[in-house]
């Protein structure tokens, strides 16, 4: 391992020990904000510290085994060779883990997020599939112990949704779900298809980090056009007799957000503003990323909703991720919220790309 990496790890261990000491300080314990911030830092440093300590132990084990290999006793030498082999394997494995733990973290990864699903091409079937995707993500959130709250929904006439925006609250929600952004295509026989022909429909998914109040962009009232209207359900029937639904247009960017799920206009406006802020920040981040992007692929997508990332093929029972050429034949499990088998390989590929980029710049 490079000396520069070892130095960085030693610095992190020193900070870990310092934070550990601070958490026992009565002044810190009495300051809830400071205690909370240090507790979060402690948990972030703990994993890399434990891994580095295991790496150092493996180095010590190797040195001890190499000394044992110099013994006159043949049985001891054979035992030493086994220990040398085990120690070298542990050192290699732990060095790889440490490199991943040292990769630059997205500051948004620990945040809650907004999940936006829109029906695309495919008519009624696209709306039904949007509903299926929302159910899939809801099941996944439940498995993770996350909370999911509908922010805004526009129901389709024959089931599902034209558009659905939900807030996902839980540890690391954005960091996990951000790889779901892009185009999702479904191939199946619709319930209304009498000839048994397979139809192709599509939905788009956008995942945006929730922005903490302290980091919210300044949105001037003069830059907003706010319309109120009556909330309506599928088929246009009115579900509310007051103008509680809100449509907010951010004039400088043309960003439009609607919210009609609450009976209170005030609550709908608050929800719409939260989504609007997330969209504005996301658009700015995508613009900056585009300015500095190179030829390296980006598994997070270009931000273009038309980027097709996944196909769900019902006749064959398969799901394919086009970014990493992965196909699994577990469609039913995936639609029941078992997404980890799809998410983990994408995260691993993303980390491999980050490591390759670091190696190029080293």
Curated annotation (Swiss-Prot):
Keyword set includes Transmembrane: no
Entries under Pfam families matching the protein: PCRF (PF03462), RF-1 (PF00472)
Main location: cytoplasm
Sites of N5-methylglutamine modification: 237
SUPFAM superfamilies to which the protein is assigned, alphabetical: Release factor
Entry comment on modification after translation: Methylated by PrmC. Methylation increases the termination efficiency of RF1.
Official protein name in the record: Peptide chain release factor 1
GO molecular function, one term: translation release factor activity, codon specific
Organism, scientific name: Vibrio parahaemolyticus serotype O3:K6 (strain RIMD 2210633)
Family listed: Belongs to the prokaryotic/mitochondrial release factor family.
GO cellular component terms, semicolon-separated: cytoplasm
Superkingdom of origin organism: Bacteria
């Amino acid at each position: 391992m490079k000396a520069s990496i070892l130095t960085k790890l030693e610095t992190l261990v020193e900070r870990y020990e310092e934070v550990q000491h601070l958490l026992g300080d009565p002044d810190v314990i009495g300051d809830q904000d400071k205690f909370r911030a240090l507790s979060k830092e402690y948990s972030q440093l703990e994993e890399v510290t434990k891994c580095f300590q295991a790496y150092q132990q493996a180095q010590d084990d190797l040195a001890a085994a190499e000394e044992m290999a110099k013994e006159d006793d043949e049985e001891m030498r054979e035992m030493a060779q086994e220990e040398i082999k085990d120690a070298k394997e542990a050192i290699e494995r732990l060095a790889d883990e440490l490199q991943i733990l040292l990769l630059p973290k997205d500051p948004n990864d620990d945040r809650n997020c907004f999940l936006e699903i829109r029906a695309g091409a495919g008519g009624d079937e696209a709306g039904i599939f949007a509903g299926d995707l929302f159910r899939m993500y809801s099941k996944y959130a439940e498995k993770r112990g996350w909370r999911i709250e509908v922010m805004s929904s526009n129901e389709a006439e024959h089931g599902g949704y034209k558009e659905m925006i939900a807030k996902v609250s839980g540890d690391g929600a954005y960091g996990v779900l951000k790889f779901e952004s892009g185009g999702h295509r479904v191939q199946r026989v619709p319930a209304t298809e009498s000839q048994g022909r397979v139809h192709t429909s599509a939905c788009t998914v956008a995942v945006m980090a929730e922005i903490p109040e302290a980091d919210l962009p300044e949105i001037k009232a003069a830059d907003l056009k706010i319309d109120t209207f009556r909330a309506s359900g599928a088929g246009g029937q009115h579900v509310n007799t007051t103008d509680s639904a809100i449509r907010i247009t951010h004039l400088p960017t043309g960003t439009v957000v609607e919210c009609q799920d609450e009976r209170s206009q005030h609550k709908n406006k608050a929800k719409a503003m939260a989504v609007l802020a997330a969209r504005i920040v996301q658009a700015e981040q995508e613009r900056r990323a585009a300015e500095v992007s190179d030829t390296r692929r980006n598994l997070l997508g270009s931000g273009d909703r038309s980027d097709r990332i996944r196909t769900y093929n019902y006749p064959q029972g398969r799901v394919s991720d086009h970014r990493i050429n992965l196909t699994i034949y577990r469609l039913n499990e995936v639609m029941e919220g078992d997404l980890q088998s799809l998410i983990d390989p994408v995260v691993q590929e993303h980390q491999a790309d980050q490591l390759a980029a670091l190696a190029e710049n080293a």
